A protein has these predicted regions:
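Serine-hydrolase-like catalytic core of hydrolytic proteins
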Residues: 15-131
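Aromatic- and Gly/Pro-rich amphipathic surface segment
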Residues: 1-23
Length: 131
């Protein structure tokens, strides 16, 4: 951990790789307020990585706390299946797997559906979501 104000190299270069796992369907929500009666716009953020690598929490700069406070928005970041877990086409094995090549995209759709249903509990406006 950082031990002084001058020692920021760990903060800048630290990657939180966490534990890789196909059970990665999580999202993070930052909100500046819940019980103040406001309906805030929602920023729905999908990390980069070319659908092959990355996560919503791998860098400290990915945390949405400051953006939520300064922008008065609700920030949602998501994880989704990547690489083979997200895009392997298993449709040759039957109808059960006909959409398997789109798992990553379906994860994103499921996260957006969750936002539509639940974001009002975090002070967000489900009708005002920016991706």
């Amino acid at each position: 951990p950082t031990t002084s104000v001058q020692d920021e190299s760990e903060f800048v270069f630290h990657h939180d790789w966490g534990f890789t796992n196909e059970n990665c369907l999580v999202l993070n929500v930052w909100t500046p307020g819940i019980n103040d009666g406001k309906k805030r716009p929602v920023l729905f953020w999908i990390h980069g990585g070319g659908f092959a690598a990355g996560s919503s929490q791998e860098l400290p700069s990915y945390e949405g706390e400051n953006l939520a406070k300064k922008g008065d928005v609700v920030v949602v970041s998501i994880n989704h299946r990547l690489n083979v877990l997200g895009f392997l086409d298993l449709s040759a094995y039957g109808d059960k797997y006909k959409n398997s090549a789109n798992n990553s995209v379906l994860d994103m759709v499921a996260a957006l559906e969750w936002v539509k249903t639940n974001i009002s509990n975090f002070g967000g406006d489900a009708g005002n979501v920016t991706i």
